[in-house]
């Protein structure tokens, strides 16, 4: 079994360690979602190269699945249905960070047998969990991203708006409420 924390002595939660828009949500996000989500979300953003909607959703789903299956880091097998094309595939980065089920450990695979969406299957021994983002949340993302794209095209301001949406969803969306089981 991997150690849970073998780089940091303490999780970096001090808001002064972060850029302004992330520092502004540090305390409320930690209060609302806990240090664990904060830690994995910030790691995922750093790994991913930017603050993105789908990588953060991957973190939230990965942590939710770990809780539901009572799974340690790097103990589950994950099948992602997010595909390999951005922006949806960014979900895979968040899943890997939050679950520890990485490509390097051979514990995650990406299914290409349907259109990409925020859905994943998690297995731990004989336990299995198949989750997706609730359609109402997906509709919010699609609507707000479409508005930003219509207004700004693919300009720098568009990417700024996407970052702001990601930060808003990170802070406001509770991982215990935004997913549902796939039957």
Q: Where on the chain are the PLM-derived regions?
A:
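Non-transmembrane, aqueous-exposed alpha-helical and coiled segments at domain scale
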Residues: 2-51, 55-183
């Amino acid at each position: 079994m991997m150690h849970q924390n073998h780089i940091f002595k303490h999780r970096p939660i001090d808001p002064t360690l972060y850029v302004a828009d992330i520092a502004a949500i540090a305390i409320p996000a930690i209060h609302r979602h806990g240090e664990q989500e904060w830690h994995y979300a910030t790691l995922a953003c750093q790994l991913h190269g930017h603050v993105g909607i789908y990588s953060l959703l991957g973190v939230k789903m990965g942590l939710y699945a770990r809780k539901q299956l009572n799974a340690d880091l790097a103990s589950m097998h994950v099948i992602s249905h997010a595909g390999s094309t951005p922006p949806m595939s960014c979900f895979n980065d968040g899943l890997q960070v939050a679950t520890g089920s990485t490509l390097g450990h051979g514990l995650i695979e990406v299914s290409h047998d349907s259109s990409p969406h925020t859905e994943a299957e998690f297995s731990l021994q004989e336990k299995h969990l198949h989750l997706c983002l609730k359609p109402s949340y997906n509709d919010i993302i699609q609507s707000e991203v479409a508005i930003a794209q219509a207004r700004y095209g693919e300009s720098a301001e568009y990417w700024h708006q996407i970052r702001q949406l990601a930060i808003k969803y990170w802070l406001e969306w509770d991982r215990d409420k935004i997913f549902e089981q796939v039957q």
